[in-house]
């Protein structure tokens, strides 16, 4: 009975042609007997990064989903990968807040940035001068798992 993950998600309906958010028709919601609410649940505010560690990554074909956007799981890869093997060998995420801001499309380069203060890191994924995702992670130190990366 121990909770190992808690998730908050907000979903919207998007018009594929105009790429704009549109209202959900009441008859679509009715079968689910769900209350209608215009209120959006929001996660934490993410601070601007002042002096981040930064690494660029090329967006590859296999990073994409069927809509031609980068798959959501890839953002976490970029967030973790920039931390480096030495850190990741001795730390595991305890709490992750991840906000998807703007989709990343095929081709091009993204920049993964982070700043660390103690066991807390702030992250930003950006491309073409736009923020695509932001994250805040609380880490827990762990014993090395009996192997050393690259040795």
Label every model-predicted segment:
Residues 1-43, 104-106, 115-151:
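HotDog/MaoC-like acyl-thioester-processing domains
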Residues 15-92, 142, 146-151:
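Hot-dog-fold acyl-thioester-processing enzymes
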Residues 57-141:
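Acidic/His-leaning functional-site neighborhoods
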């Amino acid at each position: 009975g121990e909770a190992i993950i808690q998730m908050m998600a907000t979903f919207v309906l998007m018009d594929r042609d105009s790429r704009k958010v549109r209202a959900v028709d009441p008859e679509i919601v009715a079968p689910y007997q769900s209350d209608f609410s215009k209120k959006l649940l929001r996660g934490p505010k993410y601070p601007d990064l002042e002096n981040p560690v930064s690494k660029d990554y090329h967006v590859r074909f296999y990073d994409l989903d069927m809509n031609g956007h980068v798959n959501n799981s890839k953002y976490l890869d970029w967030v973790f990968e920039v931390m480096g093997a030495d850190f990741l060998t001795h730390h595991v995420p305890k709490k992750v807040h991840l906000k998807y801001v703007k989709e990343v499309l095929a081709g091009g380069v993204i920049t993964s940035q982070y700043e660390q203060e103690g066991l807390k890191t702030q992250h930003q994924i950006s491309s073409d001068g736009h923020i695509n995702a932001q994250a805040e992670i609380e880490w827990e130190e762990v014993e090395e798992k009996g192997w050393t990366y690259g040795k």
